[in-house]
Regions:
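Phosphate/Mg2+-binding loops and adjacent switch elements
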Residues: 1-99
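Glycine-rich phosphate-binding loop signature in dinucleotide/nucleotide-binding domains
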Residues: 18-24, 128-129, 175-180
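Residue-level signal for inorganic ion chemistry
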Residues: 29, 73, 108, 138, ...
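Short, conserved loop/helix-junction motifs that constitute active-site signature segments
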Residues: 37-38, 67-72, 98-101, 127-129, ...
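Conserved beta-strand/loop subsegment of P-loop NTPase cores
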Residues: 43-46, 70-81, 96-112, 130, ...
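Short, flexible loop segments at boundaries between secondary-structure elements
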Residues: 111-115, 160-163, 199-214
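Acidic anion/phosphate-binding donor-loop and adjacent secondary structure
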Residues: 113-123
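A C-terminal functional module that forms or caps the active site or interfaces directly
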Residues: 142-177, 181-192
Length: 214
């Protein structure tokens, strides 16, 4: 697996094509509006809590284009769904989206691990029942994670998606944790573990469960 970061998608793709095998598959992240590159397969993600058909165009909402743009997608994935969704719940989304004949709809859920991990050790999540901890996340919507941990006692810091942690952020995190265990997402752990040299920093792994509904 090769990862290429480029401000210009065209230059990035040109580099990949010139330096890869002809049989390679190229996966572009966050590229639904990049019309300058023709894709063979377009996948649209929309969350269970905030589906695109209930949203509005920026700045009033979060959409970057008209809702009708979903018709360009080959596959639509409703993410962060409840595990074991009912047929009624699935039917609601299908009726709202009204997929074209050639579009496929999938439903995915997040399954959280029963363990928390860092570079030194793995602990059962039940260890978190013993004392309060600090939850730190820099993801688009931390509701799902906070809801999963709601039976535990914790304080939390919510940062924006793809947040680059500053020295000021780190000082706030360390001050608020006050020596307590710090729990974060696997994505944020990659950034924070470089900046916070503490054995008390852990992340909770996740798995994705897909259930197809066409």
């Amino acid at each position: 697996l090769r990862v290429v970061v480029a401000e210009s998608r065209i230059k990035g793709m040109d580099y990949m094509i010139k330096t890869s095998d002809t049989e390679s598959i190229y996966l572009l992240d966050d590229a639904f509006q990049h019309r300058s590159i023709f894709t063979g397969l377009s996948i649209l993600l929309t969350t269970y809590r905030n589906p695109f058909f209930k949203d509005f165009i920026l700045p009033y909402g979060n959409l970057r284009e008209n809702k009708k743009g979903y018709k360009r997608a080959n596959i639509i994935i409703v993410t962060k769904c409840p595990i074991n969704m009912s047929l009624d719940q699935k039917s609601y989304f299908i009726n709202k989206i009204k997929p074209k004949i050639d579009q496929k709809i999938f439903f995915s859920s997040i399954k959280y691990s029963d363990f928390i991990i860092n570079k030194n050790e793995t602990l059962p999540i039940k260890e978190l029942e013993k004392e309060e901890f600090l939850l730190v996340s820099g993801i688009a919507d931390s509701y799902h994670l906070r809801n999963h941990l709601k039976y535990l006692k914790f304080d939390y810091f919510d940062f924006s998606d793809h947040h680059n942690y500053s020295k000021n952020d780190l000082n706030k995190i360390l001050d608020k944790s006050n020596g307590k265990l710090i729990l974060t997402t696997e994505k944020d752990y990659v950034k924070l573990s470089v900046l916070i040299k503490s054995k008390s920093l852990f992340y909770i792994p996740i798995d994705f469960i897909f259930e197809k509904k066409e």
